Amino acid sequence: HQLLHDKGKSIQDLRRRFFLHHLIAEIHTAEIRATSEVSPNSKPAPNTKNHPVRFGSDDEGRYLTQETNKLEPYKEQPLKTPGKKKKGKPGKRKEQEKKKRRTRSAWLNSEVAESGLDGDHLSDFSTTSPELYLRRH
C-alpha cells in the first residue's frame, strides 16, 4: 500500500513540476511582451512593483508541507513479512470517558450533598438575591 502511495506521489510531483515549468514559461513570455509594448510616457500599473522575479529551483518540490523529505522520489522496498498485529479493545476509549464522567458526577453530587444545598434551596436563593442587592444599594 505504501509503495503505491509513494509511486503516486512521485508521479504527481512530476506532473506538478511540468505544469509549473510550463506556467512559468508562459508568464515569462507574457511579461516580456507586456514590457515591450509599454510606451515610455505611460505610467506603470498601480499593482505592479519592481520586485526581482525569482522562480523556484530544482529543490522547489522537496520542502513542501505534508511531503516526506526523501532524496529519491520512489524506491522499491522489500515487502514486510506479515506479522501478528496488535489490536486494541474496540470500545476502550469510550469506556475511559464513561468512567471519567461517572467519577465527575459522583464528585459533584457528593459536594452538593455535603454542603446541604438541594435544588429547592438554590432556586430560593436565586429569587431573593436581586431583592437583597436592591436593598443594599
From Swiss-Prot:
One GO CC annotation: nucleus
Biased composition (Basic residues): 82-92
Region named Disordered: 31-137
Location(s) in or outside the cell: Secreted; Cytoplasm; Nucleus
Cited SMART domains: PTH (SM00087)
Highest rank taxon of the organism: Eukaryota
Biological process terms in GO annotation: adenylate cyclase-activating G protein-coupled receptor signaling pathway; bone mineralization; osteoblast development; regulation of chondrocyte differentiation
Main location class: secreted
GO terms, molecular function: hormone activity; peptide hormone receptor binding
Biased composition (Basic and acidic residues): 69-78
Entries under PANTHER family matching the protein: PARATHYROID HORMONE-RELATED, PARATHYROID HORMONE-RELATED PROTEIN
Family: Belongs to the parathyroid hormone family.
Name of the protein in its database record: Parathyroid hormone-related protein
Species, as recorded: Equus caballus (Horse)
Gene expressing this chain: PTHLH
